[in-house]
Amino acid sequence: CSDCCQDELTVFKVEAVVIKAHYGDLLTSGTPHPVGKCAFLNDAGSCRIYEHRPYVCRSQGLPLRWIDEDEAGELGEYRDICPKNDSPDFLETLEVESCWTLGPAEEALQQVQVENQKPGTEPERLMLRDLFTQK
């Protein structure tokens, strides 16, 4: 489904380079999906860059877990899953190894971005929609 394929998604510049390398013709002569959904959806709601989609798209639908502070400042585990994939009750019974832990992959991707940009600058993110020549 494409319910999570929202507009205004951003990617690191290094991810945009991969998309540009594989979909140059689409970006220069194609038109983005209308505002409101991801620019890379076609009229049928399918992803036009699925094979080389960015990380944010690859993690959608997975059973996710992360560690964060609660209101009292205590660290706790949180989990989430798209209700179209399974119920929250099922999610709570999953072993940790069966969940995608948020944090390590994002940090590694950010490190790749930092290593490929001007020293001392913030990691650059680009809106997917802005990759298209035609708006």
Language-model region placement:
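Short loop/turn segments that flank or connect secondary-structure elements
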Residues: 3, 10-135
